[in-house]
A protein has these predicted regions:
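Extracytoplasmic/periplasm-facing segments of secreted or lipoprotein envelope proteins
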Residues: 47-104
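N-terminal Sec-pathway targeting helices
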Residues: 1-11
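Functional cores of ribonucleases/endoribonucleases
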Residues: 84-168
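Short amphipathic alpha-helical segments, especially helix-boundary/capping motifs
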Residues: 40-41, 54-58, 114, 133-136
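Hydrophobic membrane-insertion alpha-helices, especially the h-region
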Residues: 9-21
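Repeat-associated, polar segments at repeat-unit boundaries in modular proteins
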Residues: 23-25
């Protein structure tokens, strides 16, 4: 065998062995992740088809998708002002008793700390998610008038982009 070809052949064989090992170990993981992603996208597609414009929704995923799809909150949300007019007392956690099962949402969010993206004319709004009566929890969705939808699980400590509409 040619002496110049031997190192190239050895490098080729080593590359094949490493590649086989990598793809057999990580490839399985990649396929698993791809499968999970496809299942999630399929579920989202099914949810999107099953969301009714006149429906009531409270979960993070459903409310975010509803805002994305219909550009407004579901009918079961009222602003803080509307809740106060009904007799809501935040400290006592009586929102469901005075509102018939509504959640707080639709109020402006100031973004004072500038932790969410800013743009000319952009306005931010917020709503509670996963609310089950009593005192309000820490989970919120923040959504903008130009199509951005974020989730915070910990009362504005961390933000996660859920949807981004491309405005035309």
């Amino acid at each position: 065998m040619n002496k110049r070809l031997f190192p190239a052949l050895v490098a080729f064989v080593i590359t094949i062995i490493i590649g086989t090992f990598f793809f057999s170990n990580n490839g399985g993981e990649a396929n698993k992740n791809a499968q999970i992603l496809l299942e999630q996208l399929n579920k989202e597609g099914q949810k999107s088809q099953s969301l009714a414009e006149n429906g009531s929704y409270t979960s993070k995923d459903e409310v975010a998708l509803y805002i994305y799809k219909f550009n407004k909150l579901p009918k079961n949300f009222i602003t803080k002002k509307e809740a106060l007019e009904l007799g809501w007392d935040a400290k006592s956690g009586n929102l469901w008793q005075v509102s018939g099962g509504k959640s707080i949402g639709g109020d402006r969010f100031s973004n004072r700390e500038k932790r969410l993206p800013e743009a000319d004319g952009r306005k931010w709004f917020e709503c509670d998610v996963n609310y089950n009566g009593g005192r309000r929890g820490a989970e919120r969705i923040l959504y903008s008038n130009d199509g951005l939808i974020y989730y915070t699980p910990d009362h504005y400590e961390h933000f996660y982009l859920l949807y981004e509409k491309r405005m035309q």
